[in-house]
UniProtKB/Swiss-Prot annotation:
This is Triple QxxK/R motif-containing protein. InterPro entries: TRIQK. Both the conserved triple repeat of the QXXK/R motif and the hydrophobic region are essential for its activity. The hydrophobic region contributes to the endoplasmic reticulum membrane localization. The gene is triqk. It is a single-pass membrane protein.
Length: 84
């Protein structure tokens, strides 16, 4: 008798989940497939944040490379010009 009484009472959350399951079951295959593909595409998409971070990292490396060679390959020395 305890099992029969326990199975009839459900929490509101369980009732809600069962209702959603019924609604989801009623959808046809193309709608379910489109929803799944949309969710996968959203998960796999590269965000603008990552693109900006990679671009900034590349620019910083190029600037450091340029500054290194600019400072090492200049013909005049700053200290010699100020002493004369």
């Amino acid at each position: 008798m305890g099992k029969k009484d326990a199975s009839t009472t459900r929490t509101p959350v369980d009732q809600y989940r069962k209702q959603i399951g019924r609604q989801d079951y009623k959808k046809n295959k193309p709608v379910l497939k489109a929803t799944r593909l949309k969710a996968e595409a959203k998960k796999a998409a590269i965000g603008i944040k990552e693109v900006i971070l990679v671009t900034i990292a590349i620019l910083v490396l190029l600037f450091a490379f340029y500054a290194f060679f600019f400072l090492n390959l200049t013909k005049t020395d700053i200290y010699e010009d100020s002493n004369n």
